[in-house]
């Protein structure tokens, strides 16, 4: 008679990092806005996107959706003790400024804003123009 041993589920304990300085990466495309808050080395502390918050279709690309994404990411990063960030903005989207303002409104001090949008030296052919 073999006894059944209950298998204990092994769960990895979430480590609460204590980070006061970090980076905010805002990727704002024409369709969506993704906000990632990292430590100084670039390891992600928290992230949020407009689509992940339930915004769908054309509402996903609005400045309000970007603001909500930035607030959600900031609240999650404040748990880790994040106080000041350098902002890196990438892309041509409409949620760039709204996301930066939302980070400041949540109590995170913005020390610098950098535009890191990749600009081709005439690389790939762009998509054809829309005709509506």
UniProtKB/Swiss-Prot annotation:
It holds the Pfam family Ribosomal_S11. One of its GO terms (biological process) is translation. GO terms for molecular function: rRNA binding; structural constituent of ribosome. SUPFAM superfamilies: Translational machinery components. Disulfide bonds: none annotated. It comes from the Bacteria. Keywords: Ribonucleoprotein, Ribosomal protein, RNA-binding, rRNA-binding. InterPro entries: Ribosomal_uS11, Ribosomal_uS11_bac-type, Ribosomal_uS11_CS, Ribosomal_uS11_sf. GO terms for cellular component: ribonucleoprotein complex; ribosome. The keyword Ribonucleoprotein applies. Belongs to the universal ribosomal protein uS11 family. Located on the platform of the 30S subunit, it bridges several disparate RNA helices of the 16S rRNA. Forms part of the Shine-Dalgarno cleft in the 70S ribosome. Part of the 30S ribosomal subunit. Interacts with proteins S7 and S18. Binds to IF-3. This is Small ribosomal subunit protein uS11. It comes from Lachnoclostridium phytofermentans (strain ATCC 700394 / DSM 18823 / ISDg) (Clostridium phytofermentans).
């Amino acid at each position: 008679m073999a006894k059944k041993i209950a298998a204990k589920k092994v769960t990895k304990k979430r480590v609460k990092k204590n980070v006061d300085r970090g980076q905010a990466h805002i990727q704002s495309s024409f369709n969506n806005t993704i906000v990632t808050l990292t430590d100084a080395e670039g390891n992600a502390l928290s992230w949020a996107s407009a689509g992940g918050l339930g915004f769908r279709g054309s509402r996903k690309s609005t400045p309000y959706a970007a603001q909500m994404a930035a607030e959600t990411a900031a609240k999650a990063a404040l748990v880790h003790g994040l106080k000041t960030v350098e902002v890196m903005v990438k892309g041509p989207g409409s949620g760039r400024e709204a996301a930066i303002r939302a980070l400041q409104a949540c109590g995170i001090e913005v020390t610098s804003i950098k535009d890191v949008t990749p600009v081709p030296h005439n690389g790939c052919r762009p998509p054809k123009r829309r005709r509506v």
